[in-house]
Curated annotation (Swiss-Prot):
Principal location listed in the UniProt entry: plastid
InterPro entries according to UniProt: Domain_X, Maturase_MatK, Maturase_MatK_N
Origin species: Disporum sessile
Cited HAMAP family: MatK
Annotated function: Usually encoded in the trnK tRNA gene intron. Probably assists in splicing its own and other chloroplast group II introns.
Keyword tags: Chloroplast, mRNA processing, Plastid, RNA-binding, tRNA processing
Subcellular location: Plastid, Chloroplast
Name of the protein: Maturase K
């Protein structure tokens, strides 16, 4: 524990003391605005209420001026908690200012983590590989490692935790007392903290707000959990929040945590002891984590007990054991990053001949397999109004007012994204069915717009219409393998798994598969 405490103190030695004055700087809000927050309040709600995007800078200056007034933030929070009956313009200003303060403060408190990334990169050279930023880079790791493992624990990271715990976590990195007081005020005065954690679509205030603010504190909590879980000697990655909840890992997206040293963790006079496990692997994305091991089932049960007590005594969070499921890999498939993954066991008979004697040896081969979860994906398409619950394609009614090129372009992007994301599936037939459903949904949308039947529409547009739904993947793959000397027939590409190393976020249509 003394070694761990010393590491914690050394790692957090660069604490920041002067962050609160940045809240009054205009460039902080400009930084938050240009951080790639798709669909943030800086764009859409301004247009909804009759303002244009250029007025955002004026509102920022107006906010900074009013923040110098005494108790203005108290009035701001109180107004944001009221309904729209207080007046249309007054409600808009309250909501807009409240959102700017939350996103601006989130940009400020990210500074200590940004500086830590700079210092740690200067102290120790890190391998510069942009491929590690891709989500798909994790699957070659799974293919290489998971076929040799026996058990896997699927962990749903518990949330939300108490707001005071979030403040205490941030206090380890920030020693600016005004900033901490401001954070406590911001959280305690906010009546609907649970809506921060689980945004309610029926509420304007939470449907598009607070994403950056929430993701930063959620990942601060997850980072603290992982930091203390494996007792890392150095910070292995940097979390930078984005609007959709994925976080680009600037160093290693995954890693093999070797030699998990026997540790004694004292939680309320209780001691938990663990043994070394050189084949333990930990992978996390969003709210789900996977802990896999080649060891016995009892060791996995010890880890489960440890995690439950860890959340309870360190984070003061009542974690239920059912949130951690232990399964044997050879008998279980698990959802991860939109894929249904499993380890296939293929029996193999090998004939060995020595002199006049021959032997028949029975053995097995293990292979990590990834397939498309068709039923959940159809459910996601159904929620997006592309098909019915049973998978029958339907027209996208809200797109009927767009031009033909826009309609085809939108459906084409959806099919290309699905094709790229699920290119690593071992069974492409399911992917082709999904793409066919999207193609037919596009045709139905165009037919609804022009008030024609699908057959009449396709006859008028020609047979070459909608070819981009199917031809782009073959063109890309044929270009990749055209320079190889080994013959690689195109029909074999449909059975090969191709991992694209430029995918930095999970597809929206599969995002719900990985959230608890």
């Amino acid at each position: 524990m003394e070694x761990l405490q010393g590491y914690l103190e050394x790692d957090r030695s660069r604490q920041q003391y002067f962050l609160y004055p940045l809240l009054f700087q205009e460039y902080i809000y400009t930084l938050a605005h240009g951080h790639g927050l798709n669909g943030s309040i800086f764009d859409e709600p301004v247009e909804i209420f009759g303002f244009d995007n250029k007025s955002s800078s004026v509102l920022v200056k107006r906010l900074i001026t009013r923040m110098y007034q005494q108790n203005y933030l108290v009035y701001l929070v109180n107004d944001s908690n009221q309904n729209r009956s207080i007046g249309r313009n007054h409600f808009f200003y309250s909501q807009f200012f409240f959102q700017m303060v939350s996103e601006g403060f989130a940009a400020i408190v990210e500074i200590p983590f940004s500086l830590q990334l700079v210092f740690s990169s200067x102290e120790x050279e890190r391998p510069k590989s942009h491929n590690l930023r891709s989500i798909h880079s994790i699957f070659p790791f799974l293919e290489d490692k998971f076929s040799h493992l026996n058990y896997v624990s699927e962990i749903l990271i518990p949330h939300p935790i108490h707001m005071e715990t979030l403040v205490q976590i941030l206090q380890c990195w920030v020693r600016d007392v005004p900033s901490l007081h401001f954070l406590r005020f911001f959280l305690h005065e906010y009546d609907n903290w649970n809506s921060f954690i689980t945004p309610n679509k029926s509420s304007y205030a939470f449907s598009k707000e607070n994403k950056r603010f929430f993701w930063f504190f959620y990942n601060s909590y997850v980072f603290e959990f992982e930091f203390l879980l494996v007792f890392l000697r150095k910070q292995s990655y940097y979390l930078q929040s984005t609007s959709f909840g994925x976080f680009l890992d600037r160093x290693h997206f995954y890693g093999k945590k070797e030699r998990l040293i026997s540790a004694c963790c004292n939680y309320s006079q209780k001691t938990l002891r663990f043994f070394k496990d050189p084949f333990m692997h930990y992978i996390r994305y969003q709210g789900k984590a996977i802990l896999a091991s080649r060891d016995t089932h009892i060791l996995m049960k010890k880890w489960k007990c440890y995690l439950v007590n860890f959340w309870q005594y360190y984070f003061h969070f009542l974690s239920y054991p059912y949130r951690i499921q232990i399964n044997q890999l050879k008998n279980h498939s698990f959802f991860f990053l939109g894929y249904l993954s499993s380890v296939l066991i293929n029996p193999l008979a090998v004939k060995n001949k020595m002199l006049d004697h021959s032997f028949l040896i029975d053995t097995v081969t293990k292979k990590f397999d990834t397939t498309i979860p068709v039923i959940p994906l159809i459910g996601s398409l159904s929620k997006a109004k592309f098909c019915t619950v049973s998978g029958y394609p339907s027209s996208k009614t809200i797109w009927a007012d767009l031009s033909d090129s826009d309609i085809v372009g939108r459906f084409g992007r959806i099919c290309r994204n699905l094709s790229h994301y699920y290119s690593g599936s071992s069974k492409k037939q399911s992917l082709y069915r999904i793409k066919y459903x999207x193609r037919l949904s596009c045709a139905r949308t165009l037919a609804r717009k022009h008030k024609r039947t699908i057959r009449t529409l396709l006859q008028r547009l020609g047979s070459g219409f909608l070819e981009e739904f199917f031809t782009e993947e073959e063109q890309v793959l044929s270009l990749i393998f055209s320079k190889t000397t080994i013959p690689f027939p195109l029909y074999r590409l449909h059975r090969e798994r191709i991992w694209y190393l430029d995918i930095i976020r999970i597809n929206d249509l599969t995002n719900h598969l990985d959230w608890p």
